[in-house]
Regions:
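A short Gly-Trp-Pro
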Residues: 1-8, 13-141
């Protein structure tokens, strides 16, 4: 997608701007549900060199799994990224939960549906996968 999108945390201390983004994947794994504070985490991929941050120093980084880092606002706790490689590549997974306004993207898949919260009945027409979304490696802006 070629429209610059913006996202920010609840308190406004941290924000990102991404020049291009992929479509969105909805993750139902327990870690993403807890990090997002809801029934699922929503994430998209951007090129690392096309993302700019304001308040980046206010991010706290947490190794949620071996080799995977999540980042959130140290002031309000809003998740700003998904689980990114500790040794980063040219892409970054950002939290769509933090997006502002209209965006040129849509949910294209739901992953880890076997881990869905029992209280969540579902809502999307996006395909469901019991494990990880098999298209992550080809998902690009």
């Amino acid at each position: 997608m070629s429209k610059t999108v913006r996202g920010s945390c609840l308190c406004g201390a941290v924000s990102y701007a991404a020049e291009r983004i992929s479509d969105i994947v909805e993750c139902h794994c327990a870690m993403c549900r807890k990090a997002a504070g809801g029934h699922a985490g929503f994430f998209f991929v951007a090129m690392r060199n096309e993302v700019s941050w304001e308040g980046e120093g206010k991010l706290t980084h947490y190794e949620s799994s071996p080799g995977l880092i999540r980042s959130f606002c140290s002031r309000c706790g809003t998740a700003m990224t998904g689980a990114n490689l500790k040794e980063p590549d040219d892409t970054i997974i950002l939290s769509a939960n933090a997006l502002e306004g209209d965006v040129p993207a849509r949910v294209i898949a739901q992953e880890f549906c076997a881990s869905k919260a029992t209280w969540f009945a579902g809502h999307d027409e996006a395909p469901e996968f019991d494990g990880p979304y098999p298209g992550w490696e080809t998902l690009k802006p």
